[in-house]
Amino acid sequence: MPFVVMITGIPGVGKSTITRLALKRTAINFRLVNFGDLMFEEAVKQGLVKHRDEMRKLDPMVQKQLQLRAAQRIVEIARDEPVLLDTHATIRTPMGYLLGFPKEVIETIRPNFIVIIEATPSEILGRRLRDLKRDRDVETEEQIQRHQDLNRAAAISYAMHSDALIKIIENHEDKGLEEAVNELVQVLNLAVREYD
């Protein structure tokens, strides 16, 4: 049975770092798939964008088509190996927040777990300000908290349509990255039973 763990969190929460470190410690090899990368590859192929950060400004219907194509590719990959799906539950666009996984997309992927990485708005804002590699929108701490709240609500909706379990992992400056990584490893190691 395919085993897919979705890992999500708003930009600057530390999701990529936690994911990278956890994958070095799992009992089984996971294929790390970035949902945005799959969408970006398809968008470039169609001549829609040149830079990844332009995707969130595409027409929502175009984004949904890209999402569905990416979901189909994930299902193909998960037939052969467990997938850790690095993604965003919601995407802030100029028109409002877009669900990262409309109903037909989440029903296609059917993840086993949805892991949400969270931190305080001030921690996220500080991390964003230190990350000069990305062209991120500027948000206030209140907007950051709203985005995290929307991610939780989206995860509940996704779980309703996929029977996934939800795990929230906190990545606070004082808690330590190590603890967050260990929590993710525990979830990922559940895949061992599926691929033995």
UniProtKB/Swiss-Prot annotation:
| Keyword terms, alphabetized | ATP-binding, Cytoplasm, Kinase, Nucleotide-binding, Transferase
Which HAMAP family does this chain map to?
Adenylate_kinase_AdkA (MF_00234)
Instruction: State the organism of origin.
Output: Thermococcus gammatolerans (strain DSM 15229 / JCM 11827 / EJ3)
The name this protein goes by in its record: Adenylate kinase
User: What GO molecular-function term can you cite, just one?
Assistant: ATP binding
Which gene does this sequence derive from? adkA
Keyword Coiled coil listed: no
Q: Name one GO cellular component term.
A: cytoplasm
Q: Which family would the database say this protein is a member of?
A: Belongs to the archaeal adenylate kinase family.
Give the UniProt subcellular location, in the record's own words: Cytoplasm
- The record's principal subcellular location, in a coarse class, is cytoplasm
Uppermost EC category: transferase
What is the catalytic activity of this protein? AMP + ATP = 2 ADP
Q: What is its EC number?
A: 2.7.4.3
Q: Where is ATP bound in this sequence?
A: 9-17
